[in-house]
Amino acid sequence: MTGERVYQLVRELEDEVNNGGFHQFFYNSAGDDTAETIQALEMIGASRMADILMRAVARLRDGVAPQERFARQRVLPEPSALMDLDMEFYAYPDDLASLLAEYKARPDK
């Protein structure tokens, strides 16, 4: 995964969750790349944010985030079922901006 792709995935997650919670992330096309987003978070060292996203995935029916948007929308719980995870995300247990900057500054990226 390129550094640019890592940046894009993390920013999309952050934008969607900050705008409407994990429900919005999964409902919209950003959720198409859920597995890749978890990987991107881990690559920049945002393990706590990756854990929050994985726990959000576990709350979808069957604990899986289908890659296809409309299939994913059918397995979404009510927004309130994800609210506690939204609040954990909003507390920013990992400083995504700093971690992204550090990741981009690495010579191999």
Predicted regions and their residues:
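Extended, alpha-helix-rich binding/interface surfaces that flank or overlap catalytic cores
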Residues: 1-34, 40-109
